[in-house]
């Protein structure tokens, strides 16, 4: 199935219009020059130089005679002159002389026309391209005139000047000039792409490094928090932690309760006190018999470093009670 052809863009339409206008202008110029009798009958100087002839003399309708290093053969072509070398009777072509003569004709044409360098470069390029088939034609004619006993001379000698001419034509600076702006533009675009890629990669590396640093910092903080929680935690999970304020409050309540109980016991002892006479008599009897009885009174005991224990309070929850300066012995 044929694919649909897209409509031409406005840019292409503009180019087509310019091309058509150029073709119309060229046709008009060709029609104007065709009216001249000299333009159709007498060829240009470049065509005459390619034919190895002189330029058209004034009022003539054909090129002039052959150049100095050429001679006209039976068919009317200008061929190189025969040069007999010592010891050999074979004719040898002089391509250097032919090229030099063509170059002289082109230089003479440039001087007469007075063209600028921009117009001379395409002419030189066209001459270099047209010299190659002219040289091959001269060598083919020279090979036909050789003796039939030496057929290998034409096959071995013809490709040598062909390669030299092609190398000379390809080494011209005219063919490399149109490629310079395109190469500069391509190099600039490549440099811009490389710079953009380097900036993007450096930004990505910076973001990755920042994220990695933040992650490491968070990991360290969590490790420190876990270590502090395990180090400061209780040895056994069943025993609750008691603050120092709670311990002091419990000790104050215990001391208050102890003082209250002591006051009550003292009051009861005062109401149930026996007569002093009986006590004195019994003490005398005991002293006489030598049997001594020791009584301990809580109020007379030293209270410097004595620990107070109240049976009504549970001391297992307290780690270590703070002994007060006025601690009293436990009740009995």
Curated annotation (Swiss-Prot):
Provide the transmembrane region boundaries: 191-211
Highest taxon in the source lineage:
Eukaryota
- Biased composition (Acidic residues) is annotated at 282-291
Tell me the membrane topology, using the record's own terms.
Answer: Single-pass membrane protein
Composition-biased stretches, type Pro residues, lie in 322-332
Q: Does the keyword Transmembrane helix apply?
A: yes
Instruction: List the GO cellular component terms.
Output: membrane
Q: Which keywords label this protein?
A: Membrane, Phosphoprotein, Signal, Transmembrane, Transmembrane helix
Carrying Phosphoserine, the residues are: 236
Q: In which tissues is it expressed?
A: Expressed in the brain and nervous system. Not detected in liver, heart, skeletal muscle, spleen, pancreas, pituitary and adrenal glands. Expression increases when cultured neural cells are growth-arrested and begin to differentiate.
Against InterPro entries, the record matches this protein to:
NPDC1 (IPR009635)
Which positions make up the signal peptide?
A: 1-34
**One Pfam family of this protein, by short name?**
NPDC1
Q: Where is this region: Disordered?
A: 145-182, 272-300, 312-332
Q: Where in the cell is it found?
A: Membrane
Stretches of Polar residues bias are at 153-174
Q: Note whether tRNA-binding occurs among the keywords.
A: no
> What family does this chain come from, according to its entry?
Belongs to the NPDC1/cab-1 family.
Q: What does this protein do?
A: Suppresses oncogenic transformation in neural and non-neural cells and down-regulates neural cell proliferation. Might be involved in transcriptional regulation.
Its protein name is Neural proliferation differentiation and control protein 1
- Organism of derivation: Mus musculus
């Amino acid at each position: 199935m044929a694919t649909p052809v897209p409509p031409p863009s406005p840019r292409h339409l503009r180019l087509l219009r310019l091309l058509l206008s150029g073709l119309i202008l060229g046709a008009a110029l060709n029609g104007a020059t065709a009216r001249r009798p000299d333009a159709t009958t007498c060829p240009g100087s470049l065509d005459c130089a390619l034919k190895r002839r002189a330029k058209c003399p004034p009022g003539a309708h054909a090129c002039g005679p052959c150049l100095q290093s050429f001679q006209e053969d039976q068919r009317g072509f200008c061929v190189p002159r025969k040069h007999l070398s010592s010891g050999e009777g074979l004719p040898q072509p002089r391509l250097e002389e032919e090229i030099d003569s063509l170059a002289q004709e082109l230089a003479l044409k440039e001087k007469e026309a007075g063209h600028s360098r921009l117009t001379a470069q395409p002419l030189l390029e066209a001459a270099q391209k047209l010299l190659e088939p002219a040289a091959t034609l001269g060598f083919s004619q020279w090979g036909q005139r050789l003796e039939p006993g030496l057929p290998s001379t034409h096959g071995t000698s013809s490709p040598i000047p062909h390669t030299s001419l092609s190398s000379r034509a390809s080494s011209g600076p005219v063919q490399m000039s149109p490629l310079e702006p395109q190469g500069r533009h391509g190099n600039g675009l490549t440099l811009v792409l490389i710079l953009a890629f380097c900036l993007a990669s450096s930004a990505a590396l910076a973001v990755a490094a920042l994220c990695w640093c933040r992650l490491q910092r968070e990991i360290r903080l969590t490790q420190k928090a876990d270590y502090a929680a395990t180090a400061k935690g209780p040895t056994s999970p069943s025993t609750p932690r008691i603050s120092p304020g709670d311990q002091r409050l419990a000790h104050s309540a215990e001391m208050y309760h102890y003082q209250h109980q002591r006051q009550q016991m003292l009051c009861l002892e005062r109401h149930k006190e026996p007569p002093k006479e009986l006590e004195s008599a019994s003490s005398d009897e005991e002293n006489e018999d030598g049997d001594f009885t020791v009584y301990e009174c809580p109020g007379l005991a030293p209270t410097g470093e004595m620990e107070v224990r109240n049976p009504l309070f549970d001391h297992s929850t307290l780690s270590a009670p703070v002994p007060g300066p006025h601690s009293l012995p436990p009740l009995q």
